[in-house]
């Protein structure tokens, strides 16, 4: 879809304008109020189309209520409850991520990840509103994992075809918990297994689908076709870390910070990273995660 076509397609709201943020990922959608958007089926269809193309959409100057935030997100599917962060009691599915000098880093930042891949059905996408950001710092970064897959060396693509991997909440959110609480968390949210390369259910893109929640391959074989267990085959751990590190390549990324703005990303085809570089300042974000489907 060309840029000209994109702007024309937004004619359901004639003043809408779409500006790509980088060559790889992300676009700013201007002159759209998300509080009113949910009442316009044509506009919502266009937003979904733009999301599939750009993977991350940002909307400035969104003076919306929590109820409008939830209503917009719920248009794309039911909202999830986060097992660790919890939800706003008055707006189920809306998670408050408030950071201050008095609250230490609690593992929501400084790690590349795709949200909740430890679920059998990881989120379709997430809608994040910046309530308050520090004067400098506090960016959120996203990486295009379809592009990351496309640019892998061909021999790596062949090597990972058909591979599957385990994803765990215990190894991340549970890592700093007392053992009893950690085991209870894992019992409630057992590990999930997903393909290392998933197919996007709407675009057909091949996506590199490993991240900070991924612990090991479950069917890795050596060249001699000998199994050594979960992740003990020579080279398995190194290969996994190599794949996870692809999100760190700047050419695949976009970053954003703007008070009162909203970011909407396709969780199926991206990773993201909240940069913890702003203490002693405040950062207040509110997020709605949309339930997705089983990766294939």
Task: Locate predicted features.
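Non-heme Fe(II) oxygenase catalytic core, chiefly the N-lobe of the double-stranded beta-helix
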Residues: 2-262, 267-296
């Amino acid at each position: 879809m060309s840029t000209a076509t994109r702007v024309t397609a937004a004619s359901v709201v004639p003043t809408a304008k779409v500006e790509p943020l980088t060559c790889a990922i992300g676009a700013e959608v201007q002159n759209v109020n998300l509080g009113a958007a949910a009442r316009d089926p044509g506009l919502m269809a266009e937003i979904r189309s733009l999301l599939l193309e750009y993977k991350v959409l940002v909307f400035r100057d969104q003076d919306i209520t929590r109820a409008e935030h939830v209503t917009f997100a719920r248009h794309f599917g039911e909202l999830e409850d986060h097992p660790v962060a919890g939800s706003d009691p008055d707006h189920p599915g809306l998670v408050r991520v408030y950071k201050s000098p008095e609250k230490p880093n609690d593992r929501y930042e400084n790690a590349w990840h795709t949200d909740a891949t430890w679920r059998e059905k990881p989120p379709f996408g997430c809608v994040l509103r910046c309530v308050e950001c520090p004067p400098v710092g506090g960016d959120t970064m996203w990486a295009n994992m379809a592009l990351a897959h496309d640019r892998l060396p061909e021999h790596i693509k062949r090597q990972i075809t058909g591979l599957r991997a385990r994803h765990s909440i215990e190894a991340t959110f549970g890592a700093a918990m007392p053992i009893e609480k950690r085991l209870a968390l894992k019992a409630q949210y057992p590990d999930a297994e997903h393909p290392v390369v998933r197919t996007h259910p709407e675009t057909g893109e091949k996506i590199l689908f490993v991240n900070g929640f991924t612990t090991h391959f479950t069917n890795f074989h050596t060249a001699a076709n000998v199994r050594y267990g979960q992740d003990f085959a020579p080279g398995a751990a190194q290969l996994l870390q190599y794949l996870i590190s692809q999100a760190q390549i700047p050419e695949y990324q976009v970053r954003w910070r703007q008070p009162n703005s909203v970011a909407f990303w396709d969780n199926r085809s991206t990773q993201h990273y909240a940069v913890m570089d702003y203490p002693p300042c405040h950062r207040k974000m509110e997020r709605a995660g949309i339930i997705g489907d089983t990766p294939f």
